[in-house]
């Protein structure tokens, strides 16, 4: 049997009991859990450069450890020079052990690599317990070799939980180590 990821063990041993005490759950199935992490990256210049899509697929595979699916345009949009069926991005959905391992690497290795990092904002909850984090550069991940990157792109990372409210989801992600900064706690940027 494979080893249990560190964060999954932390969830079972520390976070679940803490959430049960904090929110007064009676049934153990009521305790919120992280269901999946979706990592999405748009590739805008595919019409001119097929290599951009190949590089995005390879970088996403290195970052997540899983081969991404290519997302295609649902309809043509002339102003963006996009035709129906044209590849527009790549997406990976992580679950179970890979999800916890990615979350661990994101929090402990990647996020601290961001310049002037003070924490992630707590404003990106959707009202149903899911949290979305936008990252500006893929080079914060240690798996990406900066010398081989042609174009710096960002990505969206969505943490899908089965929590009923944003407060429960906030407590869950905070317990797993997400470095949140509460509104008003941000230090002003120095000029």
Swiss-Prot record:
The keyword Secreted does not apply. InterPro entries: Ribosomal_uL5, Ribosomal_uL5_bac-type, Ribosomal_uL5_C, Ribosomal_uL5_dom_sf, Ribosomal_uL5_N. GO terms for molecular function: rRNA binding; structural constituent of ribosome; tRNA binding. One of its GO terms (cellular component) is ribonucleoprotein complex. The keyword Nucleus does not apply. Keywords: Ribonucleoprotein, Ribosomal protein, RNA-binding, rRNA-binding, tRNA-binding. GO terms for biological process: translation. Pfam families: Ribosomal_L5, Ribosomal_L5_C. This is one of the proteins that bind and probably mediate the attachment of the 5S RNA into the large ribosomal subunit, where it forms part of the central protuberance. In the 70S ribosome it contacts protein S13 of the 30S subunit (bridge B1b), connecting the 2 subunits; this bridge is implicated in subunit movement. Contacts the P site tRNA; the 5S rRNA and some of its associated proteins might help stabilize positioning of ribosome-bound tRNAs. Belongs to the universal ribosomal protein uL5 family. Part of the 50S ribosomal subunit; part of the 5S rRNA/L5/L18/L25 subcomplex. Contacts the 5S rRNA and the P site tRNA. Forms a bridge to the 30S subunit in the 70S ribosome. NCBIfam families: PRK00010.1. This is Large ribosomal subunit protein uL5. The lineage of its organism: Bacteria, Pseudomonadati, Rhodothermota, Rhodothermia, Rhodothermales. The gene is rplE.
């Amino acid at each position: 049997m494979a080893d249990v990821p560190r964060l999954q063990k932390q969830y079972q041993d520390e976070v679940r009991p803490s959430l049960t005490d904090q929110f007064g759950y009676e049934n153990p199935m009521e305790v919120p859990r992280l269901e999946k992490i979706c990592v999405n990256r748009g590739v805008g210049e595919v019409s001119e450069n097929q290599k951009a899509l190949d590089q995005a697929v390879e970088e996403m595979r290195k970052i997540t450890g899983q081969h991404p699916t290519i997302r295609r345009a649902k309809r043509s949009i002339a102003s963006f020079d996009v035709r129906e069926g044209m590849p527009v991005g790549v997406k990976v959905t992580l679950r179970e052990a890979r999800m916890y391992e990615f979350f661990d690497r994101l929090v402990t290795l990647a996020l601290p690599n961001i310049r002037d990092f003070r924490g992630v904002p707590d404003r990106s909850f959707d009202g149903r317990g899911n949290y979305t984090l936008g990252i500006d550069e893929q080079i914060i991940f240690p798996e990406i070799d900066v010398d081989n990157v042609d174009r710096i792109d960002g990505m969206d990372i969505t943490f899908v939980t089965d929590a009923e409210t944003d407060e429960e989801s906030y407590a869950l992600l905070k317990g797993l180590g997400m470095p949140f900064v509460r509104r008003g706690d941000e230090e002003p940027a120095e000029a």
